[in-house]
Amino acid sequence: MPKYRSSTTTQGRNMAGARALWRATGMNSGDFNKIIVAVVNSFTQFVPGHVHLRNVGKLVSEEIYINGGVAKEFNTIAIDDGIAMGHSGMLYSLPSRDLIADSVEYVINAHCVDAMVCISNCDKITPGMLMAALRLNIPTVFVSGGPMESGSVTLSRYNNSSDVKLSLVDAITASANPNITDIDKEQIELEACPTCGSCSGMFTANSMNCLMEVLGLAQPGNGSLLATHFDRKEMFLNAGRYIMNLSRLYYEKDNSIVLPRNIANKMAFENAAMLDIAMGGSTNTVLHLLAAAQEGEISFTMKDIDRLSRKVPHLCKIAPNSDRYYMEDFHRAGGVMGILGELQRCGLLYENTYNILNKSLLDTLRQYDIKLCQDLEIKRMYAAAPAGVRTIKPFSQNNRWNSLDIDRFAGCIRSQEYAYSQDGGLAVLYGNLAPKGCLVKTAGVISELKSFRGPAKVYESQEESVQAILTGQVCSGDVVVIRYEGPKGGPGMQEMLYPTSFLRSMGLDLHCALITDGRFSGGTSGLSVGHISPEAASAGLIGLVCDGDMININISKRSIVLEVSDYVLKNRYEIEISRGTKAWTPSCRNRDVSFSLKAYAKLVTSADTGAVRDRSQL
């Protein structure tokens, strides 16, 4: 049988000092033979998705004690990508993912913890904790804070005829839209983010929390049940019960199937990618899945994403890919288990993956897929509805829909027969501009833009591109190229939500493309191609593009090509190399880069490997 990891600090004569310190935290002699569970919280008042988490750690801890364990809570950092967006603060977002993973590892290993419950929610916190879980490989349960309710407003330009549903992205685009009055802009700003929780569309945070369900490390409903709803309280209580059950299976019955690397294995990662493709999730999720797979020593690459994207249908469009459906609507339609049920009926899923419920995926679908479900309590959980009341309190309302959305013809989730497309909501493109691949969220691309050819407008920072867009320097038909914004070149791989949102504000989103070695917010739509690998700072071809060069993007052919001769490119390469130590750096960018970000840039790899540390340098 595996020994409790905690016995290193709780057993033996020479650990008297450690036990004395444990006692000073509230433990007693009877606790030294119990499983010690870390409750890894991420409460902060800086982030709406985490502002309500102050007391939920106590709920989990109390349930762990009731079930015979000892709970010890600590906190990680959390950055709000929306508040950090559009200025130098975004340089810190992606690096914070690795800091979170490291901080969890440090606390868990320093104190020899036996198991952990991860209370996450927003963009980099869930993947950072996932990386830590796979790195540490101790019994782990994830439970997220839940999505925000969508906003709602009646605007004068609609003649007061109907309410318009809103998300954060509407506030950003309205700020630069000359056709929206100041009064309407203010109303949108006031109502776009009405409650606590992760932003209300299928953005990065909600995409990741959905993927945790199919990876097997979180309960059904984790990604879609609203933060404000009373039912979410039971999820936190369940997390305490589940972690004690998993811990006993491992430490007392030597059942290693409950460990994260055995639950979230290669098949589970492929299932997660298929879910992401089917629901048109954020492209950031690919970055995080690739990084997490490396932590778990799982062979999962961009080639796998490419292969799966060609056979998985696109079954769901949620904001920002739709102005009709938001996370509360997705939950009403059965959430993650609803989509997985449709994929299972297509014969696409690996059905025998395992999860924290101590069930196979197939058995879980039989219980939780609302098309099959006979359990009235589960149906009641999926009927959890928004209240439309501004609040930052969790579990503060108990509204229910009168009926579930089981319409698979024109509802929030479609069947394969009525899919938006048969080849998925995400695609990997290859070509001379991206020999190691790049990503596009096809769920947000209209059919007319899926083949696009245009002249390049090149910018060496996000800020420069925003200024050009807002001052009319970008025209219909252009391909906006934003480079030196990759993991190394930024450094930090900023999200390009402001450039894409302002293209939309200026009426150019249906007439232009944008490509970058940076990344995109989950709120991005339009023909936005990111994660171009290798990045400019790693001598990628995107660093040699000049204004006016023709770029050809073809999603159906999965290609992205710079139409410049090899002879011309060779000359440009030699000119770039002649810059010496300044080669493959921006020629005219004014950006202060801190010591910590410079250290990050020294070790980080390009996006095709998840922007993880280059272990060959260690």
Swiss-Prot record:
Iron-sulfur keyword on record: yes
SUPFAM superfamilies per UniProt: IlvD/EDD N-terminal domain-like (SSF143975), LeuD/IlvD-like (SSF52016)
Pfam families, per the entry: ILV_EDD_C, ILVD_EDD_N
Sites bearing N6-carboxylysine, chain numbering: 124
Keywords: 2Fe-2S, Amino-acid biosynthesis, Branched-chain amino acid biosynthesis, Iron, Iron-sulfur, Lyase, Magnesium, Metal-binding
A GO term, aspect molecular function: dihydroxy-acid dehydratase activity
UniProt gene name: ilvD
GO cellular component, one term: cytosol
This protein's name: Dihydroxy-acid dehydratase
GO terms, biological process: isoleucine biosynthetic process; L-valine biosynthetic process
Residues involved in Mg(2+) binding: 81, 123-124, 495
Textual note on the cofactor: Binds 1 [2Fe-2S] cluster per subunit. This cluster acts as a Lewis acid cofactor.
Essential cofactor(s): [2Fe-2S] cluster; Mg(2+)
EC number, UniProt record: 4.2.1.9
Biological role: Functions in the biosynthesis of branched-chain amino acids. Catalyzes the dehydration of (2R,3R)-2,3-dihydroxy-3-methylpentanoate (2,3-dihydroxy-3-methylvalerate) into 2-oxo-3-methylpentanoate (2-oxo-3-methylvalerate) and of (2R)-2,3-dihydroxy-3-methylbutanoate (2,3-dihydroxyisovalerate) into 2-oxo-3-methylbutanoate (2-oxoisovalerate), the penultimate precursor to L-isoleucine and L-valine, respectively.
Species classification: Bacteria, Pseudomonadati, Pseudomonadota, Gammaproteobacteria, Enterobacterales
Catalytic reaction equation(s): (2R)-2,3-dihydroxy-3-methylbutanoate = 3-methyl-2-oxobutanoate + H2O; (2R,3R)-2,3-dihydroxy-3-methylpentanoate = (S)-3-methyl-2-oxopentanoate + H2O
Assigned protein family: Belongs to the IlvD/Edd family.
Organism: Blochmanniella floridana
